[in-house]
UniProtKB/Swiss-Prot annotation:
This is 3-hydroxy-3-methylglutaryl-coenzyme A reductase. Residues 443-771 are annotated as: Catalytic. Belongs to the HMG-CoA reductase family. It is an enzyme of class 1 (oxidoreductase). PROSITE patterns: HMG_COA_REDUCTASE_1 (PS00066), HMG_COA_REDUCTASE_2 (PS00318), HMG_COA_REDUCTASE_3 (PS01192), HMG_COA_REDUCTASE_4 (PS50065), SSD (PS50156). Synthesis of mevalonate for the production of non-sterol isoprenoids, which are essential for growth differentiation. It is found in: Endoplasmic reticulum membrane. The chain crosses the membrane at residues 12-32, 89-109, 123-143, 190-210, 344-364. NCBIfam families: 2A060605 (TIGR00920), HMG_CoA_R_NADP (TIGR00533). Gene3D superfamilies: 3-hydroxy-3-methylglutaryl-coenzyme A Reductase, Chain A, domain 2, HMGR, N-terminal domain, Hydroxymethylglutaryl-CoA reductase, class I/II, NAD/NADP-binding domain.
Length: 856
């Protein structure tokens, strides 16, 4: 019930921002202009008689410390906001702070009867008590919206979630701080009064002005080119914000309610006592109370006079008593202004602190240090510092001159001398390149061990290039194949042998792709023109409604082949392995080989006296072929104990099936089985894809379904899924050869909506063989692309989730590519686009000169 009330309040503020803002500003102006007289505060709130002797050095030290803490706390909060990486959150929080300060100042001056000089302490208490965390959470709720219409709903949802907690916290804080106003200590009473006013102002502004202003700012933001709001396109991508994290602890809430009830009784007793005294009919008793408790004269909270200096008295009328003034109003104003501008020791301390923080922020806080990861609904944010580099080299040119790393001496040493040096503690690193080449040529050093022998991977690669150039007479063939400034330590023993360089492949980016409520920019490593542009167009068409994806199966496979003496033993072994208890024993042995590999089932086929056993297991975030091989080997050893006459012919019997087209992968699945769907509105098909629903359906049926069936295709019921799969595989360090099975895809299209003018499109990919750890994913460029997608490495909280997310991204990107290419075919734009984007600048004879893109 309470949540619904707060939701309705939030919906009203977000739906009527102008009305709420104008009403709030009007009330603020009224506080500044209507009835300037101070309120008659209850006893204990500031009417106790004080003497100037109370303001000593200890008071100044305490207040200076409070001011410093307030400044540092405010600096910490805004630095924390800047780490979120969103200029919108930072600006909105700043606006919230400024407006709250303005309302607070108005409240202090009017309702508490304070003068302007009190603000220098009141504002510091306001800064000390303001909490921007809830304001930030509400801003994140709003910024997580994927459209302008969703902003109001998300603001209402945020108010419904945060409102009850903030209301209870405000009540508790006000009552707890209000206890200080019962102390009878003048200074503590005034400070507590400021604090209570700060808490109340923060609450009122947060519940009224802030959500309305938040809605208005985002409503006035211009839309990006992709049709998304500008603040949604330009903000860093943020991870999902779970609502459970914002729900209060019910036990803590009950304790707060009980505490509030008790404190209310204390304050009620005090107010009843004060009211009874105020209504006391006996004037003598009233005077006795005033003499011992309070006086009718109210002084300012802070003394501007030093010891021994008299303050000009102010004429105050309180009841029947009159205090004469011995100075004019102009003299008083001039006096207080001069005292305000006087630089005292506490002012100097605050000024030094502010200057130090400013210098630290400007000169010592780099942008990289302020980048972190934050979670929000459907966004992803990259947390690692960004350092822009050339392609694995520090120089703009990636060509490597073909010359030795060291100049050889005038006369080379003999083979025996070189061997002696090589076997010594100094090692081959003390030899020149020519001497190492001589040892390789003579067979004393294996060519594949050059990096290890010379103890410098880059030098070893350079020497191997020289040997290859000389023995194969390549001349300058390797000049444009770079090899310098690459981290070969991650390559050795993991990715490649006999390395002679690395191959720079252009990496384009398509996106953002609206996948399951997230915006993802997808890297595509390809040398095919039009591919990135076409995929990007498909993503733009899918932006409004987004793509929905699901993982329907997960299991990497390894299919060994074993042989028995006869079919009787083969069939008996097959039936034995299918018994649940025996399978559990096989699974126990299989699972013992890895922390992540878990055998889920086995699929057995008999061919004569041969058994083809397909082990299917989940492998966490790894692609898992090595895990499967190791587990399969141990599991077969256990089966062999029961059937000693079983002969293991091969650990892979092509029943996996790996890197070959196979119906078993298409039917049973391998790796991640993913399904994606999307709805494309009719106006998008016409404006972005330049075609119609009927034309798309006709081309899809005749090309992808009938044409593939005529060709006898297995899993090839698509337009060009392999294009996108391979491009993502190369960019993210997957095994490119596995695009054979991973590209199995069926693309389906059908009319959608009441009038059938919209398009429903889906892609089913049953065998995406993919992982985020191991293999080429450890290489820095490939790891950077995984980082870009937010799936680098293993997922510690939920093993396998990163690999599943990457598989979903692949399928969603394939859907975008399919949609764009099919539209080009339906509209007859395929040849035209390839002639423009996929041709060299040199025109063929008889063709028209190409038109520059900037003039098209």
């Amino acid at each position: 019930m309470v949540g619904r009330l707060f939701r309705a309040h939030g919906q009203f503020c977000a739906s009527h921002p102008w009305e709420v803002i104008v009403a709030t500003l009007t009330l603020t102006v009224c506080m500044l202009t209507v009835d300037q007289r101070p309120l008659g505060l209850p006893p204990g709130w500031g009417h106790n008689c004080i003497t100037l002797e109370e303001y000593n050095a200890a008071d100044m030290i305490v207040m200076t410390l409070i001011r410093c803490v307030a400044v540092l706390y405010s600096y910490y909060q805004f630095c924390h906001l800047q780490k979120l990486g969103s200029k919108y959150i930072l600006g909105i929080a700043g606006l919230f702070t400024v407006f709250s300060s303005f309302v607070f100042s108005s409240s202090v001056i009017n309702f508490l009867g304070s003068d302007v000089s009190d603000l220098k302490d009141a504002l510091f208490f306001f800064l000390l008590l303001i909490d921007l965390s809830k304001a930030t959470v509400l801003a994140q709720f709003a910024l997580s919206s994927r459209s302008q219409d969703e902003v109001k709903h998300n603001i209402a949802r945020g108010i419904a979630m945060l409102g009850p907690t903030i209301t209870l916290d405000t009540v508790v804080e006000t009552l707890v701080i209000g206890v200080g106003m019962l102390s009878g200590v003048r200074r503590l009473e005034v400070l507590c009064c400021f604090a209570c006013m700060s808490v109340i102002v923060n609450y009122v502004v947060f519940m009224t002005f802030y959500p309305a202003c938040l809605s208005l700012i985002l409503e006035l933001s211009r839309s990006g080119e992709s049709g998304r709001p500008a603040w949604h396109d330009k903000s860093l991508i943020i991870k999902a914000l779970h609502e459970e994290d914002q729900k209060p602890n019910p036990v803590v809430q009950r304790v707060k309610v009980i505490m509030s009830a008790g404190l209310m009784l204390v304050h009620a007793h005090r107010w009843v006592r004060c009211l009874s005294i105020a209504l006391w009919p006996d004037l003598t008793s009233l005077r006795y109370f005033c003499t011992h408790c309070d006086t009718g004269v109210s002084y300012s909270r802070w003394s501007f006079a030093s010891e021994g200096e008299e303050l000009p008295t102010v004429k105050l009328v309180t009841g029947d008593s009159v205090v004469n003034s011995n100075s004019t109003d102009d003299a008083q104003l001039h006096y207080y202004i001069m005292r305000w501008l006087t630089v005292s020791a506490d002012h100097i301390v605050i000024l030094i602190l502010l200057l130090a923080l400013a210098v630290k922020f400007v000169f010592f806080e780099t942008r990289d240090e302020l980048t972190t990861t934050r979670g929000m609904d459907g966004w992803v944010e990259v947390s690692s510092p960004v350092e822009h580099k050339y392609v694995q080299t520090e120089q703009p040119s990636c060509s490597a001159p073909e010359q030795p790393l060291e100049e050889p001496p005038a006369s080379n040493r003999s083979i025996d001398e070189c061997l002696s040096v090589c076997k010594s503690d100094v090692g081959a690193q003390a030899l020149s390149d020519c001497e190492v080449m001589a040892l390789v040529t003579s067979g004393h050093i294996a060519g594949y061990q050059l990096e290890k022998v010379v103890r410098n991977p880059e030098r070893g690669v350079g020497i191997r290039r020289q040997i290859l150039t000389k023995t194969a007479d390549l001349k300058d063939a390797l000049d444009n194949l770079p090899y310098k400034n690459y981290d070969y330590l991650k390559v050795m023993g993991a990715c490649c042998e006999n390395v002679i360089g690395y191959m720079p492949v252009p990496v384009g980016v398509a996106g953002p792709l609206n996948l399951d409520g997230r915006l993802v920019h997808v890297p595509l490593a390809t040398t095919e023109g039009c591919l990135v542009a076409s995929t990007n167009r498909g993503m733009r068409a899918l932006m409004r409604c987004g793509v929905t994806s699901r993982i329907v199966a997960d299991g990497m496979t390894r299919g060994p082949v074993v042989r028995f003496p006869n079919i009787d033993r083969a069939s008996e072994a097959m039936l034995w392995m299918q018994v649940p208890y025996n399978f559990e024993q096989i699974k126990k042995n299989f699972d013992s080989t890895s922390r992540f590999a878990r055998l889920s089932k086995i699929h057995i086929r008999v061919a004569g006296r041969h058994l083809f056993i397909r082990f299917i297991a989940t492998t966490g975030d790894a692609m898992g072929m090595n895990m499967l091989s190791k587990g399969t080997e141990v599991a077969l050893a256990y089966v062999q104990q029961v059937y000693p006459d079983m002969e293991i012919l091969s650990l892979s019997g092509n029943f996996c099936t790996d890197k070959k087209p196979a119906a078993v992968n298409w039917i049973e699945g391998r790796g991640k089985s993913v399904v994606c769907e999307a709805i494309v509105p009719a106006d998008i098909i016409k404006s972005v894809l330049k075609t119609s629903v009927q034309a798309l359906m006709d081309v899809n049926i005749t090309k992808n379904l009938i044409g593939s069936a005529v060709a006898g295709s297995i899993g090839g019921f698509n337009a060009h899924a392999a294009n996108i799969v391979t491009a993502i595989f190369i960019a993210t360090g997957q095994d490119p050869a596995q695009n054979v099975g991973s590209s199995n895809c069926m693309t389906l299209m059908e009319p959608w909506g009441e009038d059938g003018k919209d398009l429903y499109v889906s892609c089913t990919m049953p065998s995406i063989e993919i992982g985020t750890i191991g293999g080429g994913t450890v290489l820095p460029p490939q790891a950077a692309c995984l980082d870009m997608l937010g799936v680098r490495g293993a997922n510690e909280m939920c093993p396998g989730e990163n690999a599943n997310t990457l598989a979903r991204i692949v399928c969603g990107t394939v859907l975008a590519g399919e949609l764009s290419l099919m539209s080009a075919l339906a509209a007859g734009h395929l040849v035209k686009s390839h002639m423009r984007h996929n041709r060299s600048s040199v025109s063929t004879s008889g063709s028209e000169p190409s038109t520059p893109a900037c003039k098209s």
